[in-house]
Amino acid sequence: MSIMLAMPLAYLGAALVGALIPVNAGWREPDHGITIYLADNGVHVDLILPASAHGLDWRPLLPKSDFDQVPADAGWVAFGAGERRVYLETPTWGDITPRTLWAATTGGERVMHVEWTRDPTYAARAIRLTPEQYRRLWAAIRAGFALDLNGQPVRIDHPGYGPRDAFYEGVGKASAIDTCNQWIASRLRLAGVKASLWSPFVQGLTWRYRKADHST
């Protein structure tokens, strides 16, 4: 078997094993608390949190003035993190180039993607958290933003994918090991939620959580 074939197979095998091994294995979803959501497009997962809950408010950090056009009743914020070139240079999958594929594989600066939304229930999965778990998740997401001297996230001069989203400077590097989806899994782990040990792909992350209720 050539090394060109062996390496992708080894990566896929490791991803499968990592998806089956839990961290925070003793976690159980509480009967009451704050519900958050996981939305995915088959390749990438976003975390969706309420704009304000239990005294934690995203609006001072991510003012709607940072965005072109946010509905007044948009009360939820979606967060993702990924490699700079992949995020900024590929608004659609048809825009992927060898350069962005190389960046995704070898790694580069991480940026944050933020989008306001009215309704989070389009998301595929839902997770209920205790107030303490929510506080830890909120802090873990906030720590992903690079901050200016005033403690504010640094907005990137980029039009975004639409009128309700924007990009911000992130912290650390993204790579084929620490992917966008692994970043999400790590936020859940830091909150104390059961998550997969290593989940570079969507399916390895989302399978552990219940489907969102679309009836509400």
Task: Pin down the residues of each PLM region.
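Glycine-rich catalytic cores of cysteine/serine-nucleophile enzymes that process amide/ester linkages
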Residues: 38-129
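Internal catalytic-core helix/loop-beta-alpha segment
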Residues: 124-150
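General secondary-structure edge motif
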Residues: 27, 92, 117, 121, ...
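Second-shell loop/turn segments in exported
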Residues: 120-130, 166-175
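Activation targets extended, charge/polar-rich intrinsically disordered C-terminal tails
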Residues: 3-16, 143-216
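Short, mixed-charge, low-aromatic patches
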Residues: 90-98, 135-145, 160-165
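N-terminal membrane-anchoring alpha-helices
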Residues: 1-35
